[in-house]
Each structure stands twice: as structure tokens, then as C-alpha cells.
């Protein structure tokens, strides 16, 4: 089970976007990276094709998982993630900072 998943709210801990937060668009576990909306933006020169216009576009670049932390559901501050088994035997993610169960 992954600690950070698609749709989670995360906070950037290091790098040029330190302190910014956003939603995880995708996670690449093999590369230990994630795409976060509005974070680590890069500019790329796009060649014109039949389906797309040419020009300079800005898009998100992958960011290392070690440089982001899950935002605590209670106060939005960065937290570590733990796992517990509920009474029905289901394994769930828990915010270590507040003890809150994380959705998903």
C-alpha cells in the first residue's frame, strides 16, 4: 500500500516550490516520483501537430516523493503517514500528526 496516492493533498518540503501545496495527479512508484498540480512547473517548446498548437507550454514535472509530505486532514500541515488495521480487518492510512484516518 502506498503512502501517497492520486488525489491526495500534499505539501512540498524541499526545492524551489517549498511550502506550496497541491493535489497529486499521478504517482510513479518505479521512479519514486509524483505529479502535483501547480508544483514544479516547467516550460516546454511544443512543436505544432494536427491536434495541438505549437508554442511554449507550461506543465507539471515529476517531483521526488521524498520532497513532498501528505497534508494533515485537520490543519493542512505536513505529516508522516502510518498504517493501522481497523476492527473489520481493513488496512487504512493514518496521519501521524493528528491520528486522523486518511480517505482512500
Curated annotation (Swiss-Prot):
- One cellular component (GO) term of this entry: ribosome
Family membership? Belongs to the universal ribosomal protein uL24 family.
Q: Pfam families attached here? A: KOW, ribosomal_L24
What keywords are assigned to this protein? Answer: Ribonucleoprotein, Ribosomal protein, RNA-binding, rRNA-binding
The protein in question is named Large ribosomal subunit protein uL24
**Domain of life, per the record?**
Bacteria
Q: Which gene encodes it?
A: rplX
Q: Which organism is it from?
A: Mesorhizobium japonicum (strain LMG 29417 / CECT 9101 / MAFF 303099)
Record's subunit section:
Part of the 50S ribosomal subunit.
- Tell me, in a sentence or two, what this protein's role is: One of two assembly initiator proteins, it binds directly to the 5'-end of the 23S rRNA, where it nucleates assembly of the 50S subunit.
Q: Which PROSITE patterns match?
A: RIBOSOMAL_L24
Amino acid at each position: 500500500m502506498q503512502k501517497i496516492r492520486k488525489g491526495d493533498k500534499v505539501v512540498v518540503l524541499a526545492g524551489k516550490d517549498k511550502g506550496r501545496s497541491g493535489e497529486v495527479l499521478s504517482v510513479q512508484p518505479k521512479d519514486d516520483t509524483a505529479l502535483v498540480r501547480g508544483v514544479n512547473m516547467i516550460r516546454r517548446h511544443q512543436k505544432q501537430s494536427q491536434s495541438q498548437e505549437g508554442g511554449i507550454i507550461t506543465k507539471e514535472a515529476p517531483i521526488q516523493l521524498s520532497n513532498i509530505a501528505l497534508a494533515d486532514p485537520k490543519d493542512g500541515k505536513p505529516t508522516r503517514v502510518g498504517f493501522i488495521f481497523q476492527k473489520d480487518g481493513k488496512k487504512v492510512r493514518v496521519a501521524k500528526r493528528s491520528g486522523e484516518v486518511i480517505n482512500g
